[in-house]
Amino acid sequence: MWQLWASLCCLLALADARSRPSFHPLSDELVNYVNKRNTTWQAGHNFYNVDVSYLKKLCGTFLGGPKPPQRVMFTEDLKLPESFDAREQWPQCPTIKEIRDQGSCGSCWAFGAVEAISDRICIHTNAHVSVEVSAEDLLTCCGSMCGDGCNGGYPAEAWNFWTRKGLVSGGLYESHVGCRPYSIPPCEHHVNGSRPPCTGEGDTPKCSKICEPGYSPTYKQDKHYGYNSYSVSNSERDIMAEIYKNGPVEGAFSVYSDFLLYKSGVYQHVTGEMMGGHAIRILGWGVENGTPYWLVANSWNTDWGDNGFFKILRGQDHCGIESEVVAGIPRTDQYWEKI
C-alpha cells in the first residue's frame, strides 16, 4: 500500500513541476508571467547580462545551520503597532537607512549581521555611538567557524564571533571609513550602469589585523563587542517584539529566481528555480493593501528593488523568512568611558 502511495506522490510532484512554466531567471517572459498573475508585487529588470553563477553566489547563506539558544521573551503585555519602521523610530541612527553592496561575493551572511549590529550599537547607546561595523573583518577573520567566506556562511556564527572576538569598524568600498572598509568592489549587476561586469568568481580576501593607513585607533582598540547573541523564535509576534524593543535583526530565507526581479509591493514566490539561501536585515513590518509584510534591507546596492529595500509576506514563514532570525545585544559598557 505504501508503495502505491509513494508512487502517487511522485506522480503528483512530477505533474506539478511540469505544470509550472520554466523561464530563464532574468527573462522578459518571467517578468511578464509574474505581472500577469496580478499578485501582491511587481516584477521588473534589476540585473542585466550577468552570469547565473553570479546570481547564485549572491545567495551565500547556509540555511538550517547551527543556532544559538533562543532568548525567552515575555511579550503578552507589549502593545505592538500595526506598522513599524526602524528608520522612523530611530532617525538619529544613520546606518538603519543604509544599503550596502556585497559585490561578487556570497557574503550576505556577514552583511546582514554587521548591518543589524551597527544599528543596535546606535540604538542601545541612545545614538551616542554611530559606527559602521566592518563586513570585511567578519567575512575574512571568522574563518571556518562561520562557513566558507565568499562561498557562504552561517548567520548565527557571525553573531557569535561578534560576542567572542569583536568586530572593527569599516564602511563601504573605497569609502576610507573606519578601520577595515569593504575591499570587494561593487559590480554592474544592474541595468544601464557604469560599474565593471559581475561574475560568479571571487576569492575571499585575507584576514588582516591592521587598520588601513591613516586610521586610528589600532585594530585591537577599534573592536566592538556583543554582550550576547541568540535566536528569535519563528513566532511572528516574537520577531516583531524583538525589533520593536532592540532594533533590526538578521534573517535568512530561500531565494527563487522570481525574487531577483522584485521592484515593489509585497513579495510572494510565484515561480522560478531555487537559487539558494540569502541573509538580510529585517527592520520593520506593516500591511499593504491588506497583505501583512516584513520590511527588509537587502545588500545588492540601491538600484535593486525598492531603493535596495523590499517587502515580503509576513506571518506564514514564507520561504522560511521567520525560521532563521538571529540577533544580539551590544556590550555598551565599552562605550560609556568614551562618551
UniProtKB/Swiss-Prot annotation:
Enzyme class: hydrolase
Swiss-Prot/TrEMBL GO biological process terms: cellular response to thyroid hormone stimulus; collagen catabolic process; decidualization; epithelial cell differentiation; proteolysis involved in protein catabolic process; symbiont entry into host cell; thyroid hormone generation
Positions annotated as active site in the UniProt record: C108, H278, N298
Cystine crosslinks: C93-C122, C105-C150, C141-C207, C142-C146, C179-C211, C187-C198
Alphabetized UniProt keyword annotations: Acetylation, Cell membrane, Disulfide bond, Glycoprotein, Hydrolase, Lysosome, Membrane, Protease, Secreted, Signal, Thiol protease, Zymogen
GO cellular component terms, semicolon-separated: apical plasma membrane; external side of plasma membrane; extracellular space; lysosome; melanosome; peptidase inhibitor complex; perinuclear region of cytoplasm
Prodomain residues: 18-79, 334-339
Described purpose of this protein according to its UniProt entry: Thiol protease which is believed to participate in intracellular degradation and turnover of proteins. Cleaves matrix extracellular phosphoglycoprotein MEPE. Involved in the solubilization of cross-linked TG/thyroglobulin in the thyroid follicle lumen. Has also been implicated in tumor invasion and metastasis.
Name under which the protein is recorded: Cathepsin B
Organism of provenance: Pongo abelii
Primary gene name: CTSB
